[in-house]
Amino acid sequence: MYAVIKTGGKQHRVVVNELLKVELLKAETGETIKFEDVLMIVDGETVKIGQPIVEGASVEVEVVEHGRGEKIRIVKHNRRKHYHKEQGHRQWYTLLKIKAINA
């Protein structure tokens, strides 16, 4: 059984007991969150597709930790002008553990 949820402007395929890294959420570590924006649920042969969300469906998750991702480098360069600019960025994320998929 799996579901497709929407959070942080992205869609994620989730399975029970799976860890999922999403955009930073305002929640404490150890807190349980319920996502109501379930776009699709697949249970064996049964498929429920929402228009746009599945009515009465939810996904329960537990917040495992908050952290920062890998550093990416942004480089700006103009040839022949002796101009070079480099910047780094680390995106905040929330690590979630999927507890239950309620259809």
From Swiss-Prot:
Quaternary data: Part of the 50S ribosomal subunit. Contacts protein L20.
PROSITE patterns on file: RIBOSOMAL_L21 (PS01169)
Family: Belongs to the bacterial ribosomal protein bL21 family.
Key words of the record: Ribonucleoprotein, Ribosomal protein, RNA-binding, rRNA-binding
Taxonomy, superkingdom: Bacteria
GO CC terms, sorted: cytoplasm; ribonucleoprotein complex; ribosome
NCBIfam families in the record: L21
Keyword rRNA-binding attached: yes
Record's protein name: Large ribosomal subunit protein bL21
GO MF term set: rRNA binding; structural constituent of ribosome
GO biological process terms on file: translation
PANTHER family: 50S RIBOSOMAL PROTEIN L21, LARGE RIBOSOMAL SUBUNIT PROTEIN BL21M
Function description: This protein binds to 23S rRNA in the presence of protein L20.
Keyword rRNA-binding: yes
